[in-house]
């Protein structure tokens, strides 16, 4: 027993220290796997010795038996709200009141008085909580409630990973009440909503609602699985003073294991407070969490006591609020727009309202599933949210304000742009040899490029900088070309003549010639760039690069079957089906043929990528057929036993049972009993042979890209090609292209106007190549400029 107890105490101390370094200092000291090993060792020891379990053990964060209701608790020191400032003059008036209250020399509304020291920190948008520690051990957690009475949420706060169950170090007061905010980061909020959607659970309108809803769960096991965090901002009741300043208090709390704001600062005078407010405001959208303002507090504890309180707020603190990110308004109508892939999506037309300082009259509704989830009707009062550069969105309906004449939102039967039929396509999730119909659906206009909206968006994407990079073709120019009937597919761009465009609005002789030259210059795209330009659903730049690097040629990309495509990194079966379906479409194949007929020469084509070609084994192939109940291990057993696809498909029952348990053996025989499954497997195997990547083939591959493992940097102007094209060429040779120079940089390509990067390269002794040498280098590797 003594050995077990000693080891338990040792593990708890070690895990507490690792938690502190990870959650408070942001300095993890061991890998996650090692932490998990220590945690599971402690859990096993406590399970074997339940009498040694204590409330402050790290294992007690997982949640306990669900409650039927929360009990009420009284705050010994009331949790008061703060006064608000909305304008700069409000802040200057607050500072004037503080200086007068402290009998300091006063200035006017624009300064001139004594410089009071203030603590500054962001006002987190979460749920205020009180944590009570007795002799360093967490004994109670409570909500703010009405400031005097809150709810006991002790079992839930124990599940928040960065709240210490026992304080670190020594010297803490016998009674210490820590106050702070429980919140959810933006990334955690997105993950939670995504997981809720997957299981058909409730989604949340914003991180604050998610945090509040999670913390007030009667079942603490649910809370334990939510990505909640805590940030300390002060103290309540305490048996003796900690420091003579507010910031001193927080720094000591941090030493005892409490997480505090990384943005905590000291400001001298109101001017520095306003500078801090502006700085945080500018960085607000890049912060990992949501804030709704900045809190300023007189830093001196003695001065705080002298200033005291008025009504239900302290005289020594104020919250300088940012413009609200959410507002109420009326949904006037729902209109429908058509995107590049034909998806018909709803857009909310709103009674104009100011949100975060910007007038909003339209908001995204994403799709009809979202309309149904919100229960949205035309005429509803809705909550609009706008955060940073994110398109405003409707996040909630205020049901109690729904008018009697509210109308349902209905998808149009015909395309609002071209009049073609709108079809409903059920979303399909493919896994383990079967197709699962999900609840979601997408509505598409069947008009394709005959639909002006789809055509315009397809052309805009095709000519964009990261696609074919045709300079001089902005959105308005594309709309003109389509509206004038000059362009009805991407291939038509390469048939344009001077006389076609010179008389168009915004064009003249010089701009027309420049455009034609830009179109001509785009005729030698890299394979990845060309694939991306085609606008294949779910294929972004990175997936296009994977396709190009792995398959090596446009022909193989066009021919690849879904089962073959899933060998590629980060391409699952659903994306593989999208790619295959795109190239199966006769119209898409015709557009590609026409593009090549206009003289496009796809660059960077060659053999299969070595990593891709080497990835094929019979076991892996069988696994990718997604035979029900047969995972990677079972697939490998089949490969070891039968050594060929034909052997597996034609195996008798006894041989199959020698390889697999009865259930799996039955599943394999039932799978290959279906002619369509046999055909699918045979077609995929044949394609692997045709591509030269069959497990029995002698593989012709790019064994090692010449620049594999090297880091290159581009600086200055590359005159014979765009920087993006130069980057593509280097990546096609295996290089990583970085944005800064370090001792690990292999080479810097320096064109005219190269600056600090060239200087640093010379200082570090990094190889430097001018543009002429770079072009020659590319030609030496079969790439023309």
UniProtKB/Swiss-Prot annotation:
Its EC number(s): 6.5.1.2
Keyword Manganese applies: yes
Cellular component annotations (GO), alphabetically ordered: cytosol
Pfam family, any one: DNA_ligase_aden
This protein's UniProt keywords: DNA damage, DNA repair, DNA replication, Ligase, Magnesium, Manganese, Metal-binding, NAD, Zinc
SMART domains assigned: BRCT, HhH1, LIGANc
Entry protein name: DNA ligase
Entry's family note: Belongs to the NAD-dependent DNA ligase family. LigA subfamily.
Binding site for Zn(2+): 415, 418, 445, 451
GO biological process: DNA repair; DNA replication
